């Protein structure tokens, strides 16, 4: 699978999934938990760390934004155990990060190409 702009593709268990947060998923998260910017700060130790529930909800909402139905996303996340939480934490951090900065990876690739051209 290829990631949409503002999304990522990651593997959970033995399946590859597309994740993307759109405004509607962000608003759903904020209605249930806290502001997305508070969550963002928490990922980097500048605020309250995300709870396991928040991490799982970002994963599920990212799956919905990536094209999955709500019940399918909930089922995929429910298969994850406590041993998956650190990986889910990092995936949820990436989901939010790429939603905020959808072209960041493209800029890094362009910069590397430009630097390589200068060396040649």
Residue ranges of predicted features:
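A short, sequence-level motif marking secondary-structure junctions
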Residues: 21-26
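Conserved active-site "lid/cap" helical segment
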Residues: 62
């Amino acid at each position: 699978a290829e990631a949409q702009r503002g999304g990522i593709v990651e593997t959970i268990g033995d399946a590859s999934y597309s994740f993307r947060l759109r405004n509607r998923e962000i608003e759903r998260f904020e209605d249930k938990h806290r502001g997305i910017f508070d969550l963002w700060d928490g990922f980097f130790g500048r605020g309250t760390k995300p709870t396991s529930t928040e991490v799982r909800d970002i994963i599920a909402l990212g799956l919905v934004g990536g094209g999955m139905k709500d019940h399918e996303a909930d089922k995929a996340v429910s298969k994850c155990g406590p041993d998956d939480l650190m990986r889910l934490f990092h995936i949820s951090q990436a989901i939010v990060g790429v939603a905020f900065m959808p072209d960041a990876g493209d800029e890094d690739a362009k910069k590397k190409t430009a630097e390589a051209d200068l060396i040649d």
